[in-house]
Amino acid sequence: MNTRASNFLAASFSTIMLVGAFSLPAFAQENQMTTQPARIAVTGEGMMTASPDMAILNLSVLRQAKTAREAMTANNEAMTKVLDAMKKAGIEDRDLQTGGIDIQPIYVYPDDKNNLKEPTITGYSVSTSLTVRVRELANVGKILDESVTLGVNQGGDLNLVNDNPSAVINEARKRAVANAIAKAKTLADAAGVGLGRVVEISELSRPPMPMPIARGQFRTMLAAAPDNSVPIAAGENSYNVSVNVVFEIK
């Protein structure tokens, strides 16, 4: 065999090997796709309810005076009384949190159709917010009454929550998985196939929805409460969990 023929055969062999090398991954991928088992994907829903065991109050004290200093002093005195009353009612320091202090001038706008006259400052207002966690729901009405008496005149809202809802959420998870399994079995039976093992599962949990009392409703409750008592209806909180589950088909 001459040199030219030998070179031709070597080049041909290299080309065949190169084509084969590129063909193997594609063949393996195609083979893997054709051998992957059929699957059923479903979404399961689970819900649990629980009675609230804690109230979160958002209150504010507002005071007005001729000067900012006078308004601040009056606001501080009122807030100190409110905090002292909270502690006497059994509220721990960890459950009391004061928020921002807002100082605003009070303007009087002249009756000027052309808007040429400048407004004048007649005083100042100072407000301080307070967040209170009440762990004994039976005391919520009493604490609200005392707060208003001592100086809380701005608000505010009331949320009824669960301090530790972990057990309730876990039960909702179990219900969601059970719901997914039931759905998958129904689909498999309808399709005339068998349901295999779980190959994938993921949770799509939604944050719990506490029982809120809107700000306007809260003010109405405070204003209309007879005999110094604010009625509180605890109701129930709902906890919802969704899961995506993928099953093999036998």
Swiss-Prot record:
GO biological process, one term: DNA damage response
Xref: InterPro entries: 26kDa_periplasmic_antigen, SIMPL/DUF541
Subcellular location per the Swiss-Prot or TrEMBL entry: Periplasm
Keyword Signal: yes
Keywords: Periplasm, Signal
Gene3D superfamilies per UniProt: Protein of unknown function (DUF541), domain 1, Protein of unknown function (DUF541), domain 2
Domain of life: Bacteria
GO cellular component, one term: periplasmic space
Signal peptide positions on this chain: 1-28
Name recorded for this polypeptide: 26 kDa periplasmic immunogenic protein
Organism: Brucella abortus (strain S19)
Gene giving rise to this polypeptide: bp26
